[in-house]
Curated annotation (Swiss-Prot):
Job of this protein: Probably interacts with GlcNAc residues. May promote attachment to both epithelial cell surfaces and chitin.
Name of the protein this chain belongs to: GlcNAc-binding protein A
Molecular function as annotated in GO: chitin binding
Residue ranges occupied by any Chitin-binding type-3 domain in the UniProt entry: 437-478
Signal sequence, renumbered to the chain: 1-23
Residue pairs linked by disulfide bridges in the UniProt entry: none
Organism: Vibrio cholerae serotype O1 (strain M66-2)
Length: 485
């Protein structure tokens, strides 16, 4: 009896600070969205089918961070760098072929596009562009590939949107594989966020109505000679081993992820009557050296397919605990120092880098760590300017392969002179019902905030212990109600 292997467990535990996220947003399909963005599918599985993009690089850990110069199409990212917005973190997104990325079904006409924000910046607008009917999907994305007249424009009115928004747009007529470019132009920086969305126009219904998508073969990792990859096919009663397809890795060629994905899809098509694998091409299922969707025959009684592995040499587990980071540091005469403690599980290389909001590195540290090792690390920042900063932690194995990456946010703040009672009207939330435009309150962060003029002044009174979004300085939407003094 074959056992389900224990796959690599990668954990990065960051303690001592809540994970406040300052950047920024991505195209999603959690509630109403018609399709997820390319970068979204690097981290999250597609709604309904479970498909994912692979080999995305470091951006898979930060899908909200595809940020680049604004002004598209006059300025903005260079041709060939549109998908990544010229961000080194997202460079893998610029790869472009007809079969490189998961494609989400779409139809022309009214459609809903959804954004999820980790930081809901004041917004100028959102614009949506689509590739031309005759674009070449095997060339890097350029301005020439797109119709540069946006098919949908949504005004942001220079206010903060909620953490999830829906845009109703009319999608133009197209056929086959197309790319939609969604651009979020934030109003409080000189940057925009760029998300490309890979879609496939399938007319008014599925190309092959007798086949239903039920899973996919994701080439997520290389294997070793002696390993086995196989399908796990489920019906209403659970897993049915009679429909399993196994592929033994018996050559060096088959150890490569794209190779075994292609070989397994080919074997499914050769041996299974109720299953097919590969990219749809007309009325054919064509295996590819990449992600291969799996389909089940209508009426077969089969429900879904997953991929299992029998790993001869279990992969090691890694975890890193980073503690000691404060929420904010006050700027003084001496350089800012971050005093951190690291604890490793597994043999690894740990890397820490501090960036300011503009991605300028201010401090770095890296060192090999052994299993169970505790280490104290002090990072001294090369400069200290008030605002948002990030501590980026990376785990690499002994071969230099990135295993995980996380970003933790903190603030540098100017020293404040303690306010006197004459500087404010109330200590928040005392006197809540008396707050009007111009009212000044002392907030929990020690700063003074003034209630905005009408029509925003009504938000100043909207607070309870269970609804704190407008709480000055700390609420998710406090800037809609208050000005900081």
């Amino acid at each position: 009896m074959k056992k389900q292997p224990k796959m690599t467990a990668i954990a990065l535990i960051l303690s001592g600070i809540s994970g406040l996220a300052y950047g920024h947003g991505y195209v999603s399909a959690v509630e109403n969205g018609v399709a997820e963005g390319r970068v979204t599918l690097c981290k999250f599985a597609a709604n309904g089918t479970g498909e994912k993009n692979t080999h995305c690089g470091a951006i898979q850990y930060e899908p909200q961070s595809v940020e680049g110069p604004d002004g598209f199409p006059v300025t903005g990212p260079r041709d060939g760098k549109i998908a990544s917005a010229e961000s080194a973190l997202a460079a893998a997104l610029d790869e472009q072929t007809a079969d490189r990325w998961v494609k989400r079904p779409i139809q022309a006409g009214p459609q809903t596009f959804e954004w999820t924000f980790t930081a809901n910046h004041v917004t100028k607008d959102w614009k949506y562009y689509i590739t031309k009917p005759n674009w070449n999907p095997n060339q890097p994305l350029s301005r020439d590939a797109f119709d540069l007249n946006p098919f949908c424009v949504v005004e942001g009115n220079m206010v903060q949107p909620p953490k999830r928004v829906n845009h109703e747009c009319i999608v133009p007529e197209r056929e086959g594989y197309q790319v939609i470019l969604a651009v979020w132009d934030v109003g409080d920086t000189a940057a925009s966020f760029y998300n490309v969305i890979d879609v496939k126009f399938d007319g008014n219904g599925p190309v092959l109505p007798d086949w239903n998508p039920a899973g996919q073969i994701i080439p997520s990792m290389d294997l070793s000679i002696g390993d086995t990859v196989y399908t796990r096919v489920f019906d209403n009663e659970g897993e049915n081993p009679a429909y399993r397809t196994e592929l033994k890795i018996d050559s060096e060629t088959l150890t490569k992820a794209n190779q075994w994905s292609y070989a397994l899809a080919t074997k499914i098509n050769q041996t299974q009557k109720q299953q097919r694998a590969g990219q749809l091409n007309g009325d054919q299922f064509v295996p590819v050296y990449g992600t291969n969707p799996i389909y089940l025959k209508e009426g077969s009684g089969l429900k879904s397919v997953e991929i299992g592995y029998q790993i001869e040499a279990p992969q090691p587990e890694y975890s890193l605990t980073v503690s000691g980071l404060a929420k904010e540091y006050e700027i003084g005469e001496q350089p800012i120092q971050l005093d951190l403690t690291l604890e490793a599980q597994g043999e690894m290389s740990a890397e820490l880098t501090v960036y300011n909001h503009h991605q300028k590195p201010l401090a770095s540290w890296s060192q090999a760590m052994t299993d169970g090792e505790l280490k104290s690390v002090t990072l001294e920042l090369s400069e200290a300017k008030a605002g948002h900063h990030m501590l980026v932690s990376r785990i690499k194995d002994r071969d230099g392969n990135l295993q995980d990456q996380q970003t933790l946010d903190f603030m540098l703040v100017e020293p404040q002179t303690p306010p006197t009672p004459g500087d404010y009207d109330f200590v928040f939330p005392n006197g809540l019902k008396e707050y009007v435009a111009g009212t000044k309150v002392l907030a929990s962060d020690g700063a003074i905030y003034q209630c905005k003029p009408w029509p925003y002044s009504g938000y100043c009174q909207q607070w309870t212990s269970n609804a704190t979004q407008y709480q000055p300085g700390t609420g998710s939407h406090w800037e809609m109600a208050w000005d900081k003094h």
